[in-house]
Amino acid sequence: MERMREELVRRNYATTTIHSYLKAVEHFRNHVDTPIDEVGPDDLRSYHAYLLGTRKLAVNTVVLNICALRFLYIKVLKRRDMKEDLPYPKQRLRLPVILSPGEVAQLIGAARNLYHRTILMTLYSTGLRRAELCRLKVADIDSKRMMLRVVQGKGGIDREVPLSQKLLGALREYYRWMRPETYLFPGTVNHSRADKPISEKIVWQAVHEATIHAGIKKRVTPHTLRHCFATHLLESGADLRSIQMMLGHSDLEATTVYLHLSRRHLQATANPLEQIVIPNPANLALSRRLRKPQ
């Protein structure tokens, strides 16, 4: 386990990913009778079936477990033969929940305080992931270039996101009140320690409380605002490549899901029924009685 931790750290994996991977491997080790470095294909297939069948875990959770085991056997133990025995389960495409711009305004307006309000505005205006927002530093805000820098985003990649004038105004108001020193959103309950970032749980609570106060019945999470950011940009005319860069997607295919969510793109597509001329005979029966065909 220590070798795996060292390899994860060496490869600059996020702290949350390291914790999740080690936890998944620990569970696997407790499940199998064989020493972990002597595990064979049958053990892996049995565990895979156990996760999906007996425990009935969500597919995403099973994928995380498979990722952890692949890392252990392929990257740490150098057993590349294990790759075929650790297939990813097939995932269904589930369209994420999207709020209308009006609902987003309601949500932000229902924030408990200025701290929460600024968090919600930043999430929606930048499309940041929850962990990325937590790690934001005051120095990452470039008001001269009107850009927000995301350092070491998912996959360890830096990127920049345009900074809106409205968000900059909100951040300035927030800065005058909070006076953050290092992290833009400092942690602890009373937000007094500038050397620690806010926890992801606090971000989730800020969104959850605002959802309840706004009377929104949809299931809203911090990631919902990321989906709203991308979908509303697409509906405003932004191209997929630009959205991909702002979201930090390594693959354009991950961004194409928003085509399914954009009303503008769906409604702009000509319906085939509109393209044909249907004859309308004068003697078309108008009776409500249905007759069986002869």
Feature-to-residue mapping (PLM):
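Conserved catalytic core of the tyrosine transesterase superfamily
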Residues: M1-Q294
